[in-house]
Design a protein with these regions (language model features):
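Small beta-barrel nucleic-acid-binding modules, primarily SNase/OB-fold domains
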Residues: 2-179
Length: 179
């Protein structure tokens, strides 16, 4: 009987710890900081541009493929797919920006990898967000938003301005993104 009492008491204590002890009618909502998911910036070195939204960068001596978070550029290297409108310009711009950069940094925000094993990150070039530069010039659309990323609002503002001016992909969106 003593063992049963200990098990029951342990169960009740565990239940109280899990649910919390609150007066009736009190609602509980955990405080979650969006900032907590955003990492500190890490220095990277340019290795190779894959296309407009993907590059190989070296971090702490190891080379990784980075997919730029929250943007999509027209295709240039997708198998069995022709180069899309503005795809080459987006790729050339990314390569140029990364190649001439004095300082490249990466910053994680949420999931660190995608389903293909590529690293997902914000890419900073000489203190400026590369994704925002791509969007401002009309080389990329804001895309693949899976949650509240730190710089999404900045990108959406830049996208609205680029659309309004019909820059880059916004001149012929269906040719840039035919699917």
């Amino acid at each position: 009987m003593n063992k049963l009492r200990k098990v029951t008491l342990s169960f009740i204590l565990s239940l109280l710890l899990i649910t919390g002890v609150m007066p009736a009618g009190t609602t509980y909502s955990p405080v979650v900081s969006v900032e907590a998911a955003v990492s500190k910036k890490q220095t990277a070195k340019f290795v190779k541009a894959v296309d407009g939204d993907t590059a190989k960068l070296s971090v702490k001596g190891r080379t990784y493929t980075f997919r730029f978070l929250a943007v999509d550029t027209p295709e240039t290297v997708k198998p069995n797919t022709p180069v899309a409108f503005m795809g080459k310009r987006a790729s050339d711009y990314t390569k140029s920006e990364l190649k001439k950069a004095k300082k490249i940094q990466i910053q994680y925000d949420g999931n660190k990898t995608d389903k293909y094993g590529r690293k997902l990150a914000w890419i900073w070039v000489d203190g400026k967000l590369l994704q925002d530069k791509l969007v401002k010039k009309g080389y990329a659309r804001v895309y693949y938003i899976y949650g509240k990323y730190k710089y999404t609002d900045t990108l959406k503002t830049s996208e609205r301005k680029a659309k309004k001016k019909k820059l880059g992909i916004w001149k012929n969106y269906s040719a840039a993104f035919p699917d």
